[in-house]
């Protein structure tokens, strides 16, 4: 919760600053876009993410200055994330990355994508796909932005994912051992040793 509030405040501060700049540049031509953005910001601060997303999306279409349109798009995505509309948020973030590839908030967009994939992890015993997808997105971020402030958070999440994946492999290996299927059991244990050497399950895999 603290992390989420921190990110909200960070984004609000950034966008408020840009809105003031925007008003200074062309107040007559841009007043409509600024008004839409401000309505979105007010709704966002009140927790009305549905309405906020609508206004930020409208603001993006009305801003002629690319920097402000891009920031409106980011806020629309974050509003969708706030109401757990994960697929819509991801679609909007992917569109943002294609439309504004040079925007200074691209790093944050990739972080939010990784975060959304991570939060879609439910029961790894039934479905490994969300785990694998989240791991890939987090890995991409860590390789692309290793020194980012967000890297610490994602490294922690990656460690949790790696342990979950290793636990699944060990569970399957134990099943094969119990049924005396030695070759697939060894293959599963080898996978833990090769791919998850930093997890808490490495010692058990080595001693099996």
Predicted regions and their residues:
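Sec-dependent N-terminal signal peptides
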Residues: 5-13
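Acidic, polar-rich low-complexity tracts and alpha-helical solenoid repeat scaffolds
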Residues: 2, 15-208
């Amino acid at each position: 919760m603290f992390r989420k509030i921190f990110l909200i405040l960070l984004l609000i501060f950034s966008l408020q600053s840009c809105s003031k700049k925007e008003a200074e540049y062309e107040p007559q031509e841009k007043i409509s876009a600024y008004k839409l953005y401000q309505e979105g910001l007010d709704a966002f601060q009140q927790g009305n993410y549905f309405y906020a997303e609508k206004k930020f999306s409208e603001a993006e279409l009305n801003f002629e200055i690319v920097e402000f349109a891009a920031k409106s798009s980011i806020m629309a995505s974050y509003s969708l994330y706030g109401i757990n509309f994960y697929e819509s948020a991801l679609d909007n973030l992917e569109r943002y990355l294609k439309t504004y590839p040079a925007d200074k908030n691209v790093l944050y967009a990739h972080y939010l994508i990784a975060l959304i994939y991570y939060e879609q992890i439910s029961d790894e015993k039934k479905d490994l796909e969300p785990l694998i997808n989240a791991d890939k997105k987090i890995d991409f971020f860590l390789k692309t932005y290793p020194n980012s402030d967000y890297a610490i958070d994602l490294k922690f999440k990656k460690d949790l994912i790696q342990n979950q994946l290793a636990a699944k492999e060990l569970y399957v290996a134990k099943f094969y051992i119990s049924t005396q299927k030695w070759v697939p059991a060894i293959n599963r244990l080898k996978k833990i040793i090769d791919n998850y050497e930093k997890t808490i399950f490495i010692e058990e895999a080595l001693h099996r």
